[in-house]
Amino acid sequence: MRIILITGISGSGKSVGLTSLEDAGYFCVDNLPPTLLRALVATRQEEHADKLAVAMDARSASSLIGLPADIAWLQSQGHEVKVLFLTAKTDSLIARFSETRRSHPLSHRGFSSTAAEDRRTLTECIREEREMLSGVEEISHVIDTSGMSANKLRGWIKALIESDHSPLTVLFESFAFKFGVPLDADLVFDVRMLPNPHYDSQLRPLTGRDAPVQAFLQDQPDATALLADIRGFVEKWLPAFKKDNRSYLTVAIGCTGGQHRSVYMVEQLAAHFRAHEHVILRHRELD
């Protein structure tokens, strides 16, 4: 049976993720206490189910301590198990809670009357939840949903599901340092030392997907050398990541604005590795 466990920080999109899996044919259970996981799997197996998705949150944090052992046991029974940990930057989470006017699951009282006090209380809840779930995050594939719409997250989950046949999926992601490093990055490369097409008035409105920008960077010896170095590094260490039984490897490339240099590098890397790996491409500031 294919089993996907979804957990993570409240407000990061677990409900959207679970709905996406339901649309993909998974039998979904929300807010399942981890102690009931094995029993649920046994029941679904008796019913000859082949896909199961389960969402768990911080209210079960104490029970989640035993999750690694549960995963190992399920795998020993022949099940394919993946754990997705959804997270987002604190500012994004605060904005989402503000929009929905919902209280945090760890809050034991209603929000105070002032916005400043609301923000402080919510921030404390988010910080506590991160600490409670830090152990689970370490054994999961992390997805940073900061700035993602619900539709984008659905597409991201769909791409991950479609990669289930591959032992390792490589995710190449471009980003802007001014908006922060992606929380789900395993490897981060800084390409801000390369000549910036932004300062060419004809190239400024374009992106690293466009031929003129690509031609500009291909003419830069440093860009060619850096691309070769990053490609070589990933090629050298990819076998080690596979031996570590990882399902996903996220390689993040950053520049100042996430429009030109990082986009170009990610496009080139994705094109190269698609020949022999399952690749997913994401431009955080463009998509």
UniProtKB/Swiss-Prot annotation:
Keywords, comma-separated and alphabetical: ATP-binding, GTP-binding, Nucleotide-binding
Biological role stated in the UniProt entry: Displays ATPase and GTPase activities.
Pfam families in UniProt: PapZ_C, RapZ-like_N
SUPFAM superfamilies to which the protein is assigned, alphabetical: P-loop containing nucleoside triphosphate hydrolases
Keyword presence, Nucleotide-binding: yes
Record protein name field: Nucleotide-binding protein mma_3120
PANTHER family (alphabetical): RNASE ADAPTER PROTEIN RAPZ (PTHR30448:SF0)
Similarity annotation: Belongs to the RapZ-like family.
Keyword GTP-binding (UniProt): yes
Binding residues annotated for ATP, in chain numbering: 8-15
Species assigned in the record: Janthinobacterium sp. (strain Marseille)
Annotated positions binding GTP: 57-60
GO molecular function per UniProt: ATP binding; GTP binding
